[in-house]
Amino acid sequence: MVTTIDLMDFVHELREDFFECAATLGWREFTKDRGVSMHSFRDVFLHLAYVEEQHVTEFCEGRPTPWMPEVMRIPKNRYVNVVEVRRRLREVRAMGDGRFKKWNTPEELAKPAVWVASKKYPLRLTRDSALAQCVTEHLLHLGEVEAMLWQLDVEPPTTFWIDRRVLHGKWPPPRSALYGGPLRTAVPRAGRRRPRRR
């Protein structure tokens, strides 16, 4: 059974691989405004670091703390090179991983948490739901990073869950991963299905 902790581990891995891929472009390309939600590669990655920090240290601990301003206004006077951005991402990942080890049980994930909507509405939910929100935020922004890389004719790292978690990058698939039944040869036709007669 896949948990939100597994999904957070997955987005950590994606975030790190996408960061390293984008970092090879050089600082100028890494910080160039590309017209996406957070403007540049740099700001997207730092935004995700602040988002995770807020979820893990505040919301998942049940503290209805308003969003820190840095979530939307990434400081320009800090993280002024690739090394500093990488360090920030690794610090946040280490902080998250430490908590995720403790939270990786159904009981811990079911504990009460909070999520602050529109800066002023604290919503009651479970720790699991708060982490699910953090996962979706990551996937949305990493999709932007993937699109920016494609626009620059840079092949992004694979985002396939199956490849990363089931096959562990092995291709063709090992025999142990293959389905034992027959492969369907016909694809169902699109269109409306007739209701069954009773």
Which ranges hold each PLM region?
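Active-site rim elements
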Residues: M1-L7, V82-R86, L131-V135
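Short, contiguous alpha-helical
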Residues: M8-E20, W27-R73, V116-G181
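Short secondary-structure junctions
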Residues: T24-G26, W103-N104
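Helix-adjacent hinge/juxtasegments
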Residues: P64-E107
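Acidic catalytic patch
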Residues: K102-K119
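A late-sequence structural motif
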Residues: P182-A186
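Short Lys/Arg-rich cationic patches that frequently serve as NLS/NoLS or arginine-rich RNA/DNA-binding motifs
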Residues: R189-R198
